[in-house]
C-alpha cells in the first residue's frame, strides 16, 4: 500500500428515480459484474415493495434502516509490544455509511426469501424497525468495542 498519495474520492451521480446519492451507492454495492440495470431493478423493486407494504415513503424507510445499521464505534487491532489489542475507535462518517450499506446487503443475501428483491425489502423493513441480521451485526460491533473499552487509551 503506497503511502505517497491517498486515492481521490470519485464523484457518484445520484440515481435516476429518486435523485439520491446514497441510493446510487447502494445500487453500486449490489451490482455484480457491472450489471447496473439488474441492480437498479432489484433496488427499485425492493423500494416499491416497501411502499406497497408500509404505505410510507420508501426513501424514509431506507434512510431509517441505514441509520439503524450504521456503527458509531468499532474495534481495530493495535500491536503493542508482543500483544495485539482490539482498540475501540470512532468510525468516520463515510466509513459508517459504507459499512451500513455493506451489512444490509450481506444480511439480505443471507436471507431465505426467493428473490433478491424480496430479501432486500424484508431486510430494509427489519432494519428500519431495529430488527434483523444487519442490526445484530452493528450491536455485535458495539459490544466488542464496549468490552475492549479498557484499551481505548491506545487510540491513534
UniProtKB/Swiss-Prot annotation:
Name listed for the protein in its UniProt record? Small ribosomal subunit protein uS7
Annotated Gene Ontology MF terms? rRNA binding; structural constituent of ribosome; tRNA binding
Extract the InterPro entries matched here. Answer: Ribosomal_uS7, Ribosomal_uS7_bac/org-type, Ribosomal_uS7_CS, Ribosomal_uS7_dom, Ribosomal_uS7_dom_sf
**Can you name the source organism?**
Afipia carboxidovorans (strain ATCC 49405 / DSM 1227 / KCTC 32145 / OM5) (Oligotropha carboxidovorans)
GO CC aspect terms: small ribosomal subunit
Q: Which domain of life is it from?
A: Bacteria
Is Electron transport among this UniProt entry's keywords? Answer: no
Subunit comment for this entry? Part of the 30S ribosomal subunit. Contacts proteins S9 and S11.
The answer, when asked if rRNA-binding is one of the entry's keywords, is: yes
